[in-house]
């Protein structure tokens, strides 16, 4: 089975959507499936206003239909709600083709962080648009039970679970490489307003605060918090070494639907401190490998007491192969439903 995945998020972007899709393509052949991507690298792109790291695709009339025709997929999945996602959605609807979608990004929360408008206005409008986008989908895939329940309560459906995984061979306990005062509290990810890094950097904590990643908010945060160590973006082995050097991984975001970095930290044997919100609650709630508290400082200090061996053991159970299997099951069900009809 060949599955065409339409996505506006793609390399060289560094985020959870891109990592999830990359691992999906790697694991799918184990189930006799092939993943092909319709991504921005196939089109002319322009930088997104206020966020130039993200490129928006511009497509000539007929370009999407031509690309899909060349791919000749057995099934179509739409991963994002951007220009490519909208174009492929129109293509499928005009031809009566079934498709699945996935919900990766809390745009209502992101826009509330970025637009000088009352949150109730932006949230209501954005949820309405997202609900309309996903309405024709055979299955809307959500990463966690909590997100699934929220989408269902907001009128999305049907909603299915597509769990995430972690590369436990890359992200593993290692000898520390950071020669900084301990304990080391580390945050990894895009340095952008919606990640709420200010809540972490403003904490009165012992030791050292470290930020790994890049983004539009980095210059201002570096000026405001000169005592923190900003290391820029890292990938692969270099990133894995930094995780393993930390004593606590701090995740201050309120807007992430999952947070793959949580699993990467845990696989490295590093406990997590976070707010008790969707994402961290679904991943960490009741596991004993994370400290969740509305007082983030208290969560950070509690996390220092968590057993690192338990963190590693928890993450080892979450594999990308199982994630790919869940995805392909949803796609196959949608395809078979159309055949039966």
Kindly give the residue locations of the regions a language model identified:
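Donor nucleotide-sugar binding/catalytic pocket of nucleotide-sugar-dependent glycosyltransferases
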Residues: 127-173
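Short alpha-helical donor nucleotide-sugar binding micro-motif in glycosyltransferases
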Residues: 134, 241-246, 327
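Conserved donor-binding/catalytic core segment of Leloir-type glycosyltransferases
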Residues: 141, 177-210
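Nucleotide-activated donor-binding/catalytic signature segment of Leloir-type glycosyltransferases, i.e.
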Residues: 219-238
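Aromatic "clamp/platform" in nucleotide-sugar-dependent glycosyltransferases that forms part
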Residues: 254
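Short hydrophobic beta-strand element within catalytic cores of glycosyltransferases
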Residues: 262, 267, 271-274
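A charged, aromatic-enriched C-terminal amphipathic alpha-helix characteristic of glycosyltransferases
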Residues: 305-340
């Amino acid at each position: 089975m060949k599955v065409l995945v339409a996505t506006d998020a793609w390399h060289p972007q560094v985020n959870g959507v891109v990592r999830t899709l990359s691992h999906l393509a790697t694991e799918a052949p184990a189930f006799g499936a092939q993943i092909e991507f319709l991504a921005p690298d196939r089109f002319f792109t322009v930088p997104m206003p206020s966020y130039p790291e993200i490129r928006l695709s511009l497509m000539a009339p007929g370009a999407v239909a031509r690309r899909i025709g060349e791919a000749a997929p057995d099934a179509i999945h739409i991963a994002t709600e951007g220009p490519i996602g909208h174009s492929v959605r129109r293509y499928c609807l005009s031809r009566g083709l079934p498709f699945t979608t996935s919900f990766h990004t809390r745009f209502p929360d992101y826009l509330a962080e970025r637009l000088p408008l009352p949150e109730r206005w932006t949230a209501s409008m954005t949820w309405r648009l997202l609900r309309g986008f996903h309405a024709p989908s055979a299955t809307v895939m959500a990463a966690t039970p909590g997100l699934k329940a929220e989408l269902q309560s907001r009128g999305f459906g049907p909603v299915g679970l597509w769990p995430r995984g972690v590369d436990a061979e890359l992200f593993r306990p290692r000898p520390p490489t950071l020669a900084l005062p301990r304990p080391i509290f580390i945050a990894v990810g895009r340095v952008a307003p919606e990640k709420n890094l200010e809540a972490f950097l403003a904490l009165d904590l012992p030791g050292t605060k470290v930020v790994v990643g890049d983004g539009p908010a980095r210059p201002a945060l570096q000026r405001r918090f000169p005592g923190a160590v900003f290391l820029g973006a890292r990938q692969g082995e270099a990133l894995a070494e930094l995780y393993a050097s930390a004593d606590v991984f701090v995740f201050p975001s309120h807007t992430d639907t999952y947070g793959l970095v949580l699993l990467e930290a845990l696989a490295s044997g590093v406990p997590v401190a976070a707010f008790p919100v969707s994402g961290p609650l679904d991943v960490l709630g009741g596991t004993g490998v994370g400290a969740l508290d509305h007082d983030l400082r208290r969560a950070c200090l509690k996390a220092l007491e968590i057993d690192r061996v338990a963190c590693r053991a928890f993450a080892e159970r979450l594999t990308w192969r199982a994630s790919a299997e869940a995805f392909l099951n949803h796609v196959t069900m949608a395809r078979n439903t159309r055949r039966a009809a």
